[in-house]
Amino acid sequence: MLKNQVKIGNWTYKINPSIKKYALRDAGFTQTTHGEFRYTHPLYLDSPYDTIGFVKIDVNESLTQLDILTVGNDKMTKINLFKNKKLQPVVDLLKFNLDDLVEREIISEVK
């Protein structure tokens, strides 16, 4: 795995070379006070009001570095969704969100 790639579960992603800042904003990313772009989406089993955590995606200001984390409800503690078979629907939701970002040409899946 190269330096600018992120592995989450069995998937590896990188920044799409044709990424634009306006595309990040259109996809729901917000710019932090430090200039990086952050996307946070709840992860849940049955109800979006009963979350088990969040996927947190950060892109640096120069659009060259990607970070993807699954975190608990406090948005700070890292959680591993891939160890528990009961969380497979949550893993499917995570994959759906990541596939949406691939479709929007924000990230690319490394094969």
Model-derived regions, located:
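Ser/Thr-rich, low-complexity intrinsically disordered terminal regions
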Residues: K14, S18-L63
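C-terminal basic regulatory modules in eukaryotic proteins
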Residues: K56-K111
